[in-house]
Amino acid sequence: MMKSLRVLLVILWLQLSWVWSQQKEVEQDPGPLSVPEGAIVSLNCTYSNSAFQYFMWYRQYSRKGPELLMYTYSSGNKEDGRFTAQVDKSSKYISLFIRDSQPSDSATYLCAMS
């Protein structure tokens, strides 16, 4: 009997800033997700400060500290295995795509920028 596995991806808001003293806002969406194993997952962040140049995605497993998953400078795409980070500076929008989701992907994902 084969059971369908689910991957729980929890998204949190994270605000990081090291660029002068201007007000900066970062917002993540969607909220908590449950997706079938093997699906493609899209996690998104929007930001308000066009001065941001460094874009990071962190993964944090339960009861562990966050670990750097992807790092991108300026704009464009960066791919690492099943993970792709995409930055669109003109829209102030970044995304993380996870292909072929696995149970081991169950974690909290955080976007950060500076």
Swiss-Prot record:
<feature type="disulfide bond">
    <location>
        <begin position="45"/>
        <end position="111"/>
    </location>
</feature>
<dbReference type="InterPro" id="IPR013783">
    <property type="entry name" value="Ig-like_fold"/>
</dbReference>
<keyword id="KW-1015">Disulfide bond</keyword>
<feature type="domain" description="Ig-like">
    <location>
        <begin position="24"/>
        <end position="114"/>
    </location>
</feature>
<keyword id="KW-1003">Cell membrane</keyword>
<dbReference type="InterPro" id="IPR036179">
    <property type="entry name" value="Ig-like_dom_sf"/>
</dbReference>
<dbReference type="GO" id="GO:0042101">
    <property type="term" value="C:T cell receptor complex"/>
</dbReference>
<keyword id="KW-0325">Glycoprotein</keyword>
<feature type="signal peptide">
    <location>
        <begin position="1"/>
        <end position="21"/>
    </location>
</feature>
<comment type="function">
    <text>V region of the variable domain of T cell receptor (TR) alpha chain that participates in the antigen recognition. Alpha-beta T cell receptors are antigen specific receptors which are essential to the immune response and are present on the cell surface of T lymphocytes. Recognize peptide-major histocompatibility (MH) (pMH) complexes that are displayed by antigen presenting cells (APC), a prerequisite for efficient T cell adaptive immunity against pathogens.</text>
</comment>
<dbReference type="Pfam" id="PF07686">
    <property type="entry name" value="V-set"/>
</dbReference>
<feature type="glycosylation site" description="N-linked (GlcNAc...) asparagine">
    <location>
        <position position="44"/>
    </location>
</feature>
<dbReference type="InterPro" id="IPR007110">
    <property type="entry name" value="Ig-like_dom"/>
</dbReference>
<dbReference type="InterPro" id="IPR013106">
    <property type="entry name" value="Ig_V-set"/>
</dbReference>
<keyword id="KW-0472">Membrane</keyword>
<keyword id="KW-0732">Signal</keyword>
<keyword id="KW-0675">Receptor</keyword>
<keyword id="KW-0393">Immunoglobulin domain</keyword>
<keyword id="KW-1279">T cell receptor</keyword>
<dbReference type="GO" id="GO:0002250">
    <property type="term" value="P:adaptive immune response"/>
</dbReference>
<protein>
    <recommendedName>
        <fullName>T cell receptor alpha variable 12-3</fullName>
    </recommendedName>
</protein>
<dbReference type="InterPro" id="IPR051006">
    <property type="entry name" value="TCR_variable_domain"/>
</dbReference>
<keyword id="KW-0391">Immunity</keyword>
<dbReference type="GO" id="GO:0042605">
    <property type="term" value="F:peptide antigen binding"/>
</dbReference>
<comment type="subunit">
    <text>Alpha-beta TR is a heterodimer composed of an alpha and beta chain; disulfide-linked. The alpha-beta TR is associated with the transmembrane signaling CD3 coreceptor proteins to form the TR-CD3 (TcR or TCR). The assembly of alpha-beta TR heterodimers with CD3 occurs in the endoplasmic reticulum where a single alpha-beta TR heterodimer associates with one CD3D-CD3E heterodimer, one CD3G-CD3E heterodimer and one CD247 homodimer forming a stable octameric structure. CD3D-CD3E and CD3G-CD3E heterodimers preferentially associate with TR alpha and TR beta chains, respectively.</text>
</comment>
<keyword id="KW-1064">Adaptive immunity</keyword>
